[in-house]
Amino acid sequence: MIQMQTNLDVADNSGARRVMCIKVLGGSKRRYATIGDIIVVSIKEAIPRGKVKKGDVMKAVVVRVRKDIRRADGSVIRFDRNAAVLINNQSEPVGTRIFGPVPRELRAKNHMKIISLAPEVL
């Protein structure tokens, strides 16, 4: 569960390393985001010569959360770190590569571009 002020890793090669959630999109009183949800983030740490720089405000898709995710078959999936992928206003990833596994739940939220770039889908 991601809320305001949550720090996340960036799972792509956009140049950002760490971001902080500053808003969860989807309703005026929406408090938490989970896998596949879109959040507004501020870039807190970035590498030199990247596509983004520290202080930029962008949208991101949450791809990994530490909170347990229950599936319809009763299984549970959980990741070690919270992570997100930066997207532009057309909901396309800013980076050209995705690092680490992503869950199948992204398919239901129509983030097919992220799934196709990911090295592993759980």
From Swiss-Prot:
GO biological process per UniProt: translation
Entry-linked SMART domains: Ribosomal_L14
GO cellular component: cytosolic large ribosomal subunit
Keywords: Ribonucleoprotein, Ribosomal protein, RNA-binding, rRNA-binding
Stored CDD domains: Ribosomal_uL14
GO-annotated molecular function: large ribosomal subunit rRNA binding; structural constituent of ribosome
The keyword Cell membrane is annotated on this UniProt entry: no
Function description: Binds to 23S rRNA. Forms part of two intersubunit bridges in the 70S ribosome.
Entry-linked PANTHER family: 50S/60S RIBOSOMAL PROTEIN L14/L23, LARGE RIBOSOMAL SUBUNIT PROTEIN UL14M
Quaternary structure note: Part of the 50S ribosomal subunit. Forms a cluster with proteins L3 and L19. In the 70S ribosome, L14 and L19 interact and together make contacts with the 16S rRNA in bridges B5 and B8.
Family, similarity comment: Belongs to the universal ribosomal protein uL14 family.
Protein name stated in the entry: Large ribosomal subunit protein uL14
Protein's organism: Bradyrhizobium diazoefficiens (strain JCM 10833 / BCRC 13528 / IAM 13628 / NBRC 14792 / USDA 110)
Gene this protein is translated from: rplN
